[in-house]
């Protein structure tokens, strides 16, 4: 495997934030190819220990002294410009690259790059596709945005021309990629701390489509009008899917008591196969159809598709079963956008339960402010909402928005909602208000999962 950028240097690469989900996968790919890798992170973790075992030099904490005999420094968007290692790299005139650009360089070393894009469902769909590719013995390299049991983590290094990765639109990251197959699951307003409006987002997705070579493919969700609008700029092959529209469709859909679907897959009027999923929700029927589209492109047979998709039980933090206590079921979900929350609650509603209690932690002030009205209306399917303070992530609190304001609006909308200001307060509510047969959902991209863990323990 060759990287254009690294051809003429001594192959010593340092990752700032090497313990992160995306960075660790890149580091593993390099280690496997024989490069010397070092990296720093704020804390030790399973990921840093795994990389250390594979030969990486790991530093805990950030310091100028960590850049020992290094040629290239890779960083993520989350690393501030005053990070001492960034400053040192600039002082020493080292090659400094952000994660997306570096991932693009790695993709150049593969022929069949699959980039999974969309506002929602990237991790789940990338995981589904990975299951199918492994079932078909394609021996792919995989980078996924969450832990996947079949690859024992968030990355897998293969020895073939196949490379499967998520393609995030935040700060136009995916425009640094070299996809042979692009997949667009859906397009909604998000990351409005960067994008001006939905048209800005659509224009960026159009640029993503234009990256694909003429002999490549774009796969798009035909049930999403914005996706179909974006696909109009395609010069490559186009394949669409949907529940109600598209080249590849799901028909005769039935759900079991866990909310998981069994259905037939058709291409035009030809039945291709029948599928039974092990992940719940109509949105996962849709996601699975994109995997069938990819299988069609790579001539993967029906047995491998069925085997791959039926063996997928979900990615971590995606409607993940955490446990049961006193006949109360606890499920954790990463949903942090109103469209995702609606899908999660709709899925929960199909399960056997008495009442659904949702503990939600809003993620970032910008998202909460810009999508405020959508957040107000997205909790109609839960019986009781426990609303935590906003999780700041990369942002500072400018005093423009808070969870109490959101709670007032949700209550005015008619949903039973209680504001809490700590995990312990949320736990008190759960202990006092849930009973046998209830469903506890912890929802959000921050650390709301702790509420369910505290309850179970």
UniProtKB/Swiss-Prot annotation:
GO terms for biological process: cell division; cell wall organization; peptidoglycan biosynthetic process; regulation of cell shape. ATP binds at residues 118-124. One of its GO terms (cellular component) is cytoplasm. Keywords: ATP-binding, Cell cycle, Cell division, Cell shape, Cell wall biogenesis/degradation, Cytoplasm, Ligase, Nucleotide-binding, Peptidoglycan synthesis. One of its GO terms (molecular function) is ATP binding. It is an enzyme of class 6 (ligase). InterPro entries: Mur-like_cat_sf (IPR036565), Mur_ligase_C (IPR004101), Mur_ligase_C_dom_sf (IPR036615), Mur_ligase_cen (IPR013221), Mur_ligase_N (IPR000713), MurCDEF_pg_biosynth (IPR050061), UDP-N-AcMur_Ala_ligase_MurC (IPR005758). It catalyses: UDP-N-acetyl-alpha-D-muramate + L-alanine + ATP = UDP-N-acetyl-alpha-D-muramoyl-L-alanine + ADP + phosphate + H(+). It is found in: Cytoplasm. It comes from the Bacteria. Cell wall formation. NCBIfam families: murC. PANTHER family: UDP-N-ACETYLMURAMATE--L-ALANINE LIGASE (PTHR43445:SF3), UDP-N-ACETYLMURAMATE--L-ALANINE LIGASE-RELATED (PTHR43445). Belongs to the MurCDEF family. This is UDP-N-acetylmuramate--L-alanine ligase. It comes from Clostridium perfringens (strain SM101 / Type A).
């Amino acid at each position: 495997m060759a990287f254009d950028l690294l051809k003429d240097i001594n192959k010593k690469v340092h990752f700032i934030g090497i313990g992160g989900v995306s960075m660790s996968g890149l580091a593993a790919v390099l280690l496997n190819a024989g490069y010397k890798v070092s990296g720093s992170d704020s804390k030790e973790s399973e990921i840093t220990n795994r990389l250390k075992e594979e030969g990486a030099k790991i530093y805990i904490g950030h310091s100028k002294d960590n850049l020992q005999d290094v040629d290239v420094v890779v960083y993520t968007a989350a690393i501030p410009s005053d990070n001492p290692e960034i400053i040192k790299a600039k002082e020493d005139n080292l090659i400094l690259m952000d994660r997306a650009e570096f991932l693009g360089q790695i993709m150049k070393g593969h022929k069949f790059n699959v980039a999974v894009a969309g506002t929602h469902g990237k991790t789940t769909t990338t995981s589904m596709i990975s299951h199918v590719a492994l079932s078909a013995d394609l021996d792919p390299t995989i980078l996924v945005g969450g832990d996947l049991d079949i690859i024992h983590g968030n990355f897998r290094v293969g020895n073939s021309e196949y490379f499967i990765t998520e393609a995030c639109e935040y700060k136009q990251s995916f425009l640094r990629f070299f996809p042979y197959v692009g997949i667009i699951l859906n397009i909604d307003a998000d990351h409005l701390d960067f994008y001006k409006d939905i048209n800005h987002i659509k224009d960026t997705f159009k640029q993503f489509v234009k990256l694909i070579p003429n002999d490549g493919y774009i796969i798009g969700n035909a049930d999403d009008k914005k996706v179909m609008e974006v696909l109009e700029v395609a010069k490559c092959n186009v394949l669409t899917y949907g529940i109600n529209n598209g080249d590849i469709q799901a028909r005769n859909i039935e759900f079991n008591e866990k909310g998981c679907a069994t259905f037939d897959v058709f291409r035009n009027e030809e039945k291709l196969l029948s599928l039974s999923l092990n992940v719940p929700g109509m949105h996962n029927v849709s996601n699975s159809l994109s995997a069938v589209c990819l299988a069609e492109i790579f001539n993967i047979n029906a047995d491998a598709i069925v085997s791959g998709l039926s063996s997928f039980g979900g990615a971590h933090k995606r409607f993940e079963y955490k446990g049961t206590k006193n006949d109360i079921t606890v499920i954790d979900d990463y949903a942090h956008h109103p469209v995702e929350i609606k899908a999660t609650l709709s899925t929960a509603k199909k399960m056997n339960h008495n009442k659904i209690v949702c503990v939600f932690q809003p993620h970032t002030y910008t998202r909460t402010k810009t999508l405020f009205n959508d957040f107000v209306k997205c909790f109609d399917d839960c019986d009781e909402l426990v609303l935590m303070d906003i999780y700041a992530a990369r942002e500072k609190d400018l005093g423009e928005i808070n969870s109490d304001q959101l709670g007032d609006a949700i209550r005015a909308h008619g949903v039973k909602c209680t504001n809490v200001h700590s995990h312990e307060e949320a736990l008190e509510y759960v202990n006092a208000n849930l009973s046998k047969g209830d469903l506890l959902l912890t929802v959000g991209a921050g650390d709301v999962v702790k509420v369910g863990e505290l309850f179970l323990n």
